[in-house]
């Protein structure tokens, strides 16, 4: 198992944790001095009270929690949000309220999930053209919505 260094920046911060034995993502909780209201169609930057030291070659991805999206229309506008291996500041979550009512975030609310993923830096090779494929340039719904039999 990969060990990642974490610093609790606030004494009441809840550190990320897996909710089930085989969960891919860890729940990330808000660390607030006072509740934050996220107005409809607005965003709020929510602190978590912790910072990470990720190994080179890894990133942390912040993703929405499905229950918040389903019940309250709360998501992350930049999903997945990337935390780079060389970032040492507090992890913060941008929440967006797609709902019609204000959404209150309380201290300790689980507001996102975090997945640790391997990443690789690449080098581009500029060429005059790309190799041909059956798909070609088809994209953005080119296969339709009906099930494929």
Swiss-Prot record:
Keyword Magnesium: yes
Record-level GO BP terms: dUMP biosynthetic process; dUTP catabolic process
Residue numbers binding substrate: 65-67, 78, 82-84, 92
Pfam families noted in UniProt: dUTPase
Leader sequence residues: none
Transmembrane region(s): none
Reaction(s) catalysed by this chain's protein: dUTP + H2O = dUMP + diphosphate + H(+)
EC number: 3.6.1.23
SUPFAM superfamilies named in the record: dUTPase-like
A molecular function GO annotation: dUTP diphosphatase activity
UniProt KW keywords: Hydrolase, Magnesium, Metal-binding, Nucleotide metabolism
InterPro entries, alphabetized: dUTPase, dUTPase-like, dUTPase-like_sf, dUTPase_trimeric
Pathway this chain belongs to: Pyrimidine metabolism; dUMP biosynthesis; dUMP from dCTP (dUTP route): step 2/2
UniProt cofactor(s): Mg(2+)
Keyword Secreted: no
Matches recorded under HAMAP family: dUTPase_bact
Similarity comment: Belongs to the dUTPase family.
Role according to the record: This enzyme is involved in nucleotide metabolism: it produces dUMP, the immediate precursor of thymidine nucleotides and it decreases the intracellular concentration of dUTP so that uracil cannot be incorporated into DNA.
The protein, known as: Deoxyuridine 5'-triphosphate nucleotidohydrolase
Gene coding for it: dut
């Amino acid at each position: 198992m990969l060990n990642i260094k974490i610093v609790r920046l606030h004494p009441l911060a809840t550190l990320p944790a897996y909710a089930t034995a085989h969960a891919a993502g860890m729940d990330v909780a808000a660390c607030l001095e006072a509740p934050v209201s996220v107005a409809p169609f607005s965003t709020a930057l929510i602190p978590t009270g912790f910072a990470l030291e990720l190994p080179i070659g890894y990133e942390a991805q912040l993703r929405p929690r499905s229950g918040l999206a389903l019940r309250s229309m709360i998501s992350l506008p930049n999903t997945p949000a990337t935390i780079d291996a060389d970032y040492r500041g507090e992890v913060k979550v941008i929440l967006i309220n797609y709902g019609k009512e204000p959404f209150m975030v309380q201290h300790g609310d689980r507001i996102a999930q975090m997945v640790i993923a391997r990443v690789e830096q690449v080098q581009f090779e500029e060429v005059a053209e790309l190799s041909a494929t059956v798909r070609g340039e088809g994209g953005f719904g080119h296969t339709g919505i009906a099930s494929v039999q």
